[in-house]
Amino acid sequence: IVVYIWGDNGSSGEGQNGTISELLAQNGIPSTVEQHIAALEELGGLDALGTPATDNQYHAAWAWAGSSPYQGMKLLASHLGGTRNPMFVSWPGHIEPDPVPRTQFHHVVDLVPTIYEILGISHPETVNGVPQDPIDGTSLAYSIDDAGAEGRRRTQYFEIMGSRSIYSDGWMASATGPRLPWVQGMPAGIQTWTPDQDRWELYHLDEDWSQAHDLAADHPEKLAELKELFAIEAARNDALPVGGGLWVPVMHPEDRISPPYTAWDFAGDTVRIPEFCAPALGNRPNRVEIRLSVPDAANGVLYKLGGAGGGLTCFLLDGVLTYEYNLFLVQRTVVRSGAPLAAGDHTVEIVTTYAELRPGGPLDVVLRLDGEEVGSGTVPVSAPLLFSANDCLDVGRAYGGAVSRAYADRMPFALDGRIDGMHVAYL
């Protein structure tokens, strides 16, 4: 049995005004078109789009168009453009091909009970001794052989970051919420927002499947009924408080899920530690100490976190100790030692502290060689969440994307020396 769902909730509006590094949006960092164009020119102009040098994303207007004929996009649970996806089911020898689409309302939680029913098995009460939660879904197997069968899913709620909706027997009530994916920075008024402030819309999907006609003013009693039902379903499914998902990405990035450790010791050949599991070198006060042995005019990466679309790195370039903080391509901060390292054994330290303790606040960076300060600088804006959703921490070389353009054409730019160990500690 092959079940294929095409989509990621909806088209992505995180490109905002069009971006060369989409995690600017997730980090809530405002930027201008002029900044993007200037950075793109440094990368080679339009030809750099779609290459490993960028992490580009289309303008949010294309996301809305991509969700057509529905309203909305990913990160909006209020409208079907952010929740509805086509699904295909294939079971050769058991399901005959049928060009007639099934229009019954269903949710992804319905897939497991569907497979259970098709295979004639039941939901296990325990797995490895762990009691299992009850199944919430409703099997859609009944619709496989009967395109016109009456739908069996009566109710379904949706919620993300305060954007929410509730479906019930052909009707849907929708509240957009305080955050629009295409608006940069913190939502206006978010510090005093409450869900009670939001305006609700009402649609009769049985007659208006694309949510073109808001009936809230015509059927206030129906809207009130569905709003109450949303509160019941949200409570039953542990989805309260409404808008709780705004806490980390918008208001308190320091509370994001992260490793419990405060210190690490890495071997000199450690590579491919996902950023989610690695030390937060770009937004937590920290000290990195590296014991190494190098020849004259040594070259190579000491470590890097993130990738081409954003990250930080420390490397040697003709012996010069160099630190670079790449803020999603639109801002690069480089700190260098005044003189190259001499051949031999050394201890390199990179100390990072906040100049202003706030999400996205500026960072002071100090480079030390064998206990002596050899360089310092300030990163004007830091990344409050993370640099990359798919790149890593590497020691002694750089895999994935090149954080610095200084070694982009020399990847993986392995150190032509030896790292005996790297110690990282939060301050």
Feature locations, PLM:
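Active-site rim elements
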Residues: 57, 72-76, 95-106, 123-131, ...
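Active-site regions of oxyanion-processing enzymes, predominantly non-cytosolic
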Residues: 1-23, 80, 143-144, 225, ...
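Metal-dependent active-site segment of extracytoplasmic phospho-/sulfohydrolases and closely related
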Residues: 1-17, 44-48, 64, 368-371
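Substrate-binding rim/cap in mid-to-C-terminal beta-strand-loop elements of soluble/periplasmic
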Residues: 24, 31-150, 321, 325, ...
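Short, solvent-exposed loop/turn and secondary-structure capping segments
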Residues: 1-2, 13-28, 98-99, 117, ...
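C-terminal, low-complexity/hydrophilic appendages and adjacent surface loops
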Residues: 65, 69-85, 158-217, 222
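Beta-strand elements within well-structured catalytic alpha/beta cores of enzymes
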Residues: 1-10, 86-89, 111-116, 203, ...
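Extracellular glycan-associated modules
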Residues: 241-427
